[in-house]
Amino acid sequence: MIEAIINGLNYRLNEETLTAEVTAKRNGYEGDIIIPENVVFNDVTYRVTSIGEYAFRYCESLTSIVIPESVTSIGEYAFYECLSLTDITFQGTMAQWNEIILREDWNNNTPAKVVHCTDGDVEI
C-alpha cells in the first residue's frame, strides 16, 4: 500500500488491484470536494473504489461532496460530525447507490438527508 496526496485529497493506493481509497487528512477537508473516479500517481492510474473509515470525520466546514460511481464502499464514520455537509452527490444511479456497502454510522450527525443520483434522490 502507498499513502499519497493527490490534488489535495489523501489516498491509500493498492498496487496489486490498482484501486484507491480516500483517507483522512491531518487538518481535515473543507468546502466543496469532488472525488475523481481515477487518480494517477507515478504514472500509474488507480480507480477510486472506497471512502475509508473516518475519512471526513469532524470536517465541520465540508459543505458538499461529489462521489464517483466507481465507489463501492463507504467506511464507518466516514462523514461523522460533518456539521455543514448539506449536499451529497453520487455520479451513478439510485440502483448503484443502493449497492454501495455503507458501514455503520457512515453519515452520523450530518445535515444531508438525501443523496442526489443521476436519476433521482435517495433518502439517507
Q: How would you name each of these model-derived features?
A:
Residues 80, 100-105:
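A structural signal for leucine-rich repeat
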Residues 1-6:
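N-terminal low-complexity, Pro/Thr/Ser-rich intrinsically disordered segments
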Residues 106-111:
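Short mixed-charge
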Residues 53-55, 75-80:
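Consensus positions within tandem repeat domains that build extended binding/scaffold surfaces
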Residues 24-26:
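Acidic, Ser/Thr
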Residues 8-10, 15-19, 28-50, 59-73, ...:
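Structural signature of tandem-repeat unit edges
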